[in-house]
Amino acid sequence: MTATLTVALPKGRLLEPALALFRHAGYEPAEPATTRKLLVPSSDGVLAFLFVKPADVAVYVESGAADAGIAGTDVLREAAADVLEPLALGFGACRMVVASPEETPFPSLPGGATPRVATKYPRLTRAFFAEMGLGVEIITVAGSVEVAPLLDLSHWIVDLVDTGRTLRENRLVERARILDVGAVVVVNRASHKLKLERHQELLKALQDAKTLGRKSAPGTTGDLAS
């Protein structure tokens, strides 16, 4: 049986709560999440689950390679993805913030020096500081952002925060909030028109699972950040 919808799911922190939601909605992957396969059908053959890096969900869905997916709003805003966002899922909640060592001034440096900002989100970071009227040097890193000020790579960082534990462990303090982040369902615009009934069925099942079963589904409070 050919799957009617291909759904891109992000590897990492969001995968467990995303799979729990789909299971509660009645879509069980035919193979365990530990499989090395990147494309796995649901047990009933209705869906095909595509496991990709979080930042790639928007790429696959926007291009039409996947009909739908689950993504954090952080990667969607960074990519400026042209996709539909019909359903917020209520997990993966955190915030994107500016942080720095307590002794490092913010929002300006002594002598008018240009601040260096380390981040995985260069577009959003640039836009935030441009709105403040502040010129900064963006240093794009793929991970371990919190260590950048400790090694004098940057003065400030922009990253995701939930409890703030990781900031405290690295002697950083939150300076400004850029945006609130959470997991959402994303849908390709053309696919939504061409496969409207299938998308409506899936969205209703996910909405019902979110509303009625989220408390009993394991891992549905998973976070994007710490």
Enumerate the language-model features and the residues they cover.
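Domain-level signature for soluble enzymes in the chorismate/prephenate branch of the shikimate pathway
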Residues: 1-226
